[in-house]
């Protein structure tokens, strides 16, 4: 029996159900009868739900269509991810750190809040997690970090994106320096007097992240 790990953005890149059907027919023609979907998103948001709905139509064509848990979708996965961030980033005591996720509009973004609390519980107190949209946004972060800077005397914030792929959310929404109607995270921090170190790296640039969340099927049932 042949299994395929199918990273979901490859399916979502098909903008119509006809294109999606063609992709799935190609898989069937190549002998695939099980599709294992690894969500390339941090939480079970709109994109994952959309893909689930689209694939539901084709479930009778395959013996199994199974979804792995998103990065922040379980306590075990979140704990692994927090340890991964500590190992990859290091969190030097010289700086404050801001991790920026996408978030969901109209959402409490509870997964990101839990990640922040988990990092603090592991002794990493100089880090906060914020989102581009929904609760826990950059405006809320600015209020919090200004107080922290007064207490710590630190001058510089290092920004890391909590986004898996390098795209416009990273290059524009977080790090853009161009004049636009909506200011980037970088611009908002600089306008509020903070010195910023940019780390323009998606999570997929970390080998440990790819090994755990993108390249293997160990989290799927047999």
Question: Where do the PLM segments sit?
Answer:
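Active-site-proximal alpha-helix that buttresses catalytic centers in soluble enzyme cores
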Residues: 1-222
